[in-house]
A protein has these predicted regions:
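Conserved nucleotide-cofactor-binding alpha/beta core module
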Residues: 89-212
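Class I SAM-dependent transferase core
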Residues: 2-101, 109, 113, 117, ...
């Protein structure tokens, strides 16, 4: 699904579109409403974040279609409906919305959505070139309530704990205990879990130190891979 490693560079990320982008974002919000997204905060975030700035210039005209798109390095930017659905489940299940941990920054689009929903976003990316690209894009868009790290998402956020929410944007076969341990009481974790042909969303709640798990929709994500890639 993704392009070959290194085939997409930060300099090719789309800019411009202006008022066209605003109109197409509004249409995308309407599509998400029709598909069942109800959170006004999530819909407002989708309506505010310019998705075309997170994809290659050649794909900018398709940025507001409800489809995933390649971002290089065998990775994709998720379908807007899935981004909205996971974000909606995340905030609905979380007692607080101060801090959120995202495992898998990718191009930074989901990160930007979370920045509209939480006071502070911590995000880890294992692919160095994607980390650099997302850092540059978010800085250009003046998204300042985020901290990005290049590292192994399997290990969670070094020195961090008690996140109100945790979101995984790649699928492990089982949720790593190191990540689950960083979820605060009253917090919610949302992740795609399973092998490629059999993945479903998992919604995990921390209720007084005990974890309760709920199964959600069938999804398809790239696998969560341990380690880092230069």
């Amino acid at each position: 699904m993704g392009a070959k490693p290194g085939s997409m560079k930060p300099s090719t990320v789309a800019r411009g579109l202006g008022s066209v982008s605003r109109r197409t974002r509004a249409r995308l919000v309407h599509v998400l409403k029709e598909r069942g997204i109800r959170s006004l905060d999530v819909l407002a975030a989708v309506g505010s974040v310019p998705r075309h700035r997170f994809v290659d210039e050649a794909l900018a005209s398709r940025a507001y279609e409800d489809i995933p798109l390649p971002i290089g390095y065998q990775q994709t930017i998720s379908q807007p409906f899935i981004v909205a659905l996971m974000s909606e489940k995340l905030i609905a299940g979380s007692a607080g919305r101060k801090t959120v941990l995202e495992v898998g920054t990718g191009c930074g689009y989901q990160t930007a959505i979370l920045a509209h929903l939480y006071e502070w976003v911590c995000s880890i990316e294992r692919i160095q070139l994607l980390f650099e690209r997302s850092e540059n894009t978010l800085a250009t868009l003046e998204v300042h309530n985020v901290e990005l790290r290049y590292g192994d998402g399997y290990e969670g956020w070094e020195g961090g704990s008690n996140f109100d929410s945790i979101l995984l944007t790649a699928a492990p076969e089982q949720i790593p205990p190191t990540i689950l341990a960083q979820l605060a009481p009253g917090g919610c974790l949302v992740a795609p879990v399973g092998k490629a042909a059999d993945q479903r969303l998992r919604i995990v709640s921390n209720k007084g130190g005990r974890f309760y798990e709920e199964e959600g929709e069938a999804v398809r994500f790239v696998p969560l891979v341990p380690g880092i890639s230069e």
